[in-house]
């Protein structure tokens, strides 16, 4: 179901805001960012920390035997980090229609039915990004464990 009709054109930009700005908006009553965006941010920070281990490991004689593997891990973490940052924005985008759907009128039976239909579609869409964030977190954990074992 296309929910574009209840979206407003508004640039989010949460992934490029300062930490202070993000946390201030997160702590407000604004509908976004929310838990999904915060989770994606934590995922990006976690992968960045894994990459830090990789950066501190490559180029050292002591770790020469795992250097190629570390570069490959860093490459994978770089991509996950980008994915997480994108998911901050994506979570806000998919939550906006749900937020608006909550405010739909429900006076008549037709309005109630329409709201229920829109809510179901909006809920499915809004849940898709947190699910993707969880999947990416599982990928990141595997990489972090490998960084820890080799770095």
Predicted region positions:
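Amphipathic alpha-helix face/heptad-repeat signature
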Residues: 41-45, 73, 80-87, 122, ...
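Transmembrane signal-anchor/signal-peptide helices with a preference for the extracytoplasmic
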Residues: 52-64
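Conserved phosphate/anionic-ligand binding catalytic regions in large, soluble enzymes, centered on
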Residues: 28-51
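Long, contiguous binding/interaction regions
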Residues: 2-12, 114, 118
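Short, hydrophobic/aliphatic alpha-helical segments
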Residues: 14-33, 149
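Amphipathic, well-ordered alpha-helical segments in soluble domains
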Residues: 18, 22, 45-52, 87, ...
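Amphipathic alpha-helical interface segments
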Residues: 91, 95-151
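A structural-propensity feature for long, helix-poor, extended segments
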Residues: 61-103
């Amino acid at each position: 179901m296309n929910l574009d009709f209840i979206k407003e054109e508004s640039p989010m930009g949460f992934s490029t805001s300062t930490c202070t700005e993000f946390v201030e908006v997160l702590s407000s009553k604004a509908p976004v960012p929310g838990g999904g965006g915060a989770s994606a941010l934590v995922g990006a920070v976690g992968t960045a920390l894994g990459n830090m281990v990789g950066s501190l490991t490559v180029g050292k004689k002591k770790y020469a035997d795992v250097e190629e593997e570390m570069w490959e891990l860093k490459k994978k973490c770089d991509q996950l980090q980008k994915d997480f940052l994108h998911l901050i924005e994506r979570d806000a985008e998919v939550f906006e229609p749900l937020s608006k759907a909550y405010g739909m009128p429900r006076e008549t039976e037709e309005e109630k039915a329409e709201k229920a239909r829109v809510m179901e579609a909006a809920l499915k869409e809004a849940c898709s990004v947190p699910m993707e964030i969880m999947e990416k977190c599982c990928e990141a954990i595997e990489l972090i464990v490998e960084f820890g074992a080799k770095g």
